[in-house]
């Protein structure tokens, strides 16, 4: 216990280390940082009153910006939610970067406040502090009976039991939501999705609040700060210099088979070049000294894209519905990105030629999150401050400007703006808390996505007995396809689905309703038992599923492949096999089958393995190989032996196909999985080793390094045990890694797609210690190739760390995840530092 306390205190000391160390962690050794700002007449960064700030904005014709709330009513806002009566629940990160070194950032001064407009003039004039004393709160969700609030690493369920808008009860609902560390590199969002789950950025989890408890389910990792959805529940997110990505299918489908991870259908890039067009000089950015970052003193390209929103309101022109608004707080601007869809794939482009939707001449305008409002307008959360960059990445270049231009002064301010279209009157927010279920169902017909979402949430929370019959009618007979879609998901959340409603929805005129029907059919089928009524319900779905499997819409066909494996009903698997044979050229269809067969891959192969078309058709052959690979990765001796028996029973071409699939899984990109130990050589393997076909012989011979027996099955000698000092170093390294490196490289060492390469088995880490030390000391700039994948991002040097901290991090990572490399000593780090002086 004393040792752990000592380690924690060491980390605390590191967090508060001197200016010359911590504040320059963003620097790279030997990199020149010319003071380019001195060549421009940079205006003062004096704080403006909210009214003065209004004059600093330039918004495109047809729009007007208004103050919805402002200091002293708001302090350092980072996120918000509207409740059912139009009140704003704002999350305030009041300890964020209180000075250039971030000293005091661990203070428990954060809060969640409720803002109200009591006189109806459109500006919030009353503040009630719901909960205070929080450390870096970052997300909020309104749920049944209360509010979920994120305070890393805890997700609190907070309740107001007496109606005064102040939390009287605070219960730990989930531990492990967000880690303590760089703000923009930990979980955030808690965005209610169309499918009744809460989605997050910088996260691999989705959450659902049911009966007072938080359910947690794995999903795909996505985004950095902020997450949004469109009218069909598709998710959008971004990451610093990458302003917008879109998932065209629900990410949960891509992770349901741990032995076949895929990002197919995810992360579509929705921008062209990286150019931005700001309204002022932007020399005060972290890497403004780098070529291409500034254009005549103004930010030239995306560097700090933050919480986006997809427009779903009814106050702007209809042609903007589905377009994206993206804030760039480093450039004091907001982009309107026009999104178009063709053949199921999205693309995006700036709505204006070399201009932005909204710009400001005020350097302290920091739009960090955007939202759709009850009135159909876009709302802007402005953190309003000089310092935006977190201490973990501040460069000397930025630090000098912060001090010289007093960007560290005048903190604790904040604004929330509303942008109104001048062509239509803004509607007042409805008071939905007092409305009955019939009135709430009526809101599903609204053209305002916020109203539909809020009505769905309230209907699911209340779960009143009279609502399902009306919702079933809405799901099948409403004139508006969005209402039909929402009604289906509302029924799903209430447990009110039935087979006739789903069957009718599967034949709906609109493809997005058919997609929703397929998805809710999964949930419905999962609730059915073995009773006669439940069996009849399953059977009743088959005709409609058979019909939708012939759908002409490409998006619907993809959803068929994703949903059918999850629907356990008579005749569904044969329907699925026939469907995949017909549409195997679609990679999402192929992956949908493979991920959906998690745990059933062998049985499926046993049914199709002898079929000629599954051997001769290239796309079907790829599926067979992938399924064989899944069985191999399961490392189950019995199932692997059954797979080898299946291979032996096939003609030569079938043997090659299955053996090739096993080999590809056993030796991914040159790496080797841990061998599977058999008591003796499998007879089927011995038989194929005597094959007349040379290719079969080669594949079996290579496989003998993965399937082992006898002397070869003896485990390798374990790595030498760590000494007591090295073990303490390992424990310190684990804490430091989690607080810093783990934000990108992840707790499992698998890295972040498109950004941070995996550390697991990386030769850059477990190879020569000097190489690993050098990377940590100096950083690395891509492109860099790890396990056959190229990564083209930069990792800053960790020059703010002392030698003992670098040694600790490397000792931990070189021994974690079954690594066997030697620990790194402080002396090794010091030697390398001295050699470079």
List the model feature ranges, each with a label:
Residues 421-422, 745-751, 777, 781, ...:
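Detector for the c-type heme attachment site
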Residues 24-439, 450, 458-461, 498, ...:
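Beta-propeller domains with acidic blade repeats across secreted/periplasmic ectodomains
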Residues 726-752, 765-778:
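Sequence/structural segment immediately N-terminal to covalent heme-attachment motifs in c-type
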Residues 381, 403-413, 419-735, 752, ...:
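Long, ordered, helix-rich scaffold segments
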Residues 7-16:
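Bacterial N-terminal signal peptides
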Residues 370, 381, 416, 733-747, ...:
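The canonical Cys-X-X-Cys-His
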Residues 29-44, 715-720, 725, 786-837:
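Flexible coil segments in periplasmic/lumen-exposed cytochrome c-class electron-transfer proteins
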Residues 402-404, 477, 751-787, 792-802:
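Gly/Gly-Pro-rich "capping" loops immediately C-terminal to redox-active cysteine motifs
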